[in-house]
Amino acid sequence: MSDYLESVSPSQRSRIEGTLDARGGGGRAHDECSGDLIAHYAGQYPIWVFLEVVEFGVLVDLWRYCSGRWGERGMRDEHYVLTSVKALRNACAHNSLLVNGFTSTAANAGHQVSRFIAISLAEHGISKTKSRRAKLKNLRVAQIAATLYSVNNFCELDTTQERHAKRMGEVRSYAEGCGVLSRANDGIVSFFDFVWKMLDTWLPVE
């Protein structure tokens, strides 16, 4: 972990260490959940502790660092996926209405879909068609795809996947049952249909 912290800018390192010091200290910013763990390993974090206590954005950046240090193309591609997850997470944290991005004129993703996501979709019957390319070109849909793929790929506990699948199933049932989609235009409906297909691919409700 010391090598990673040496690799980041002084300001970024100061922010990471300052946040951890505050959460592990005895002041008002003390973290009731992980503060004692931080205090115990302060300055000498094993990677499993570091990953447990840092912000998600730091985890994503550490993933980038490791991919470069060991020349792991797979980790590099996964880093781009996790960057999209981070962006969606930040949007949700700021109460952004994601559905507002479900239009053909909304912001583009600005990058090609990850080869991991593309391969996984194809393996589950969602082939590389003009419609798929158009949907994944949409920024919000691309971020949702990255997040659903990541839950499927990185969350290895069956109980974790089942819990998330159940929650997303409830979201789907609500969206389909409240009548909003029946009153929406065809463009909005097609975006939701594609999201449901991805949900069936990566987080199916048993």
What are these regions, as identified by a protein language model?
Residues M1-R76, V99, S150-R163:
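Short, contiguous, well-structured surface segments enriched in hydrophobic/aromatic residues
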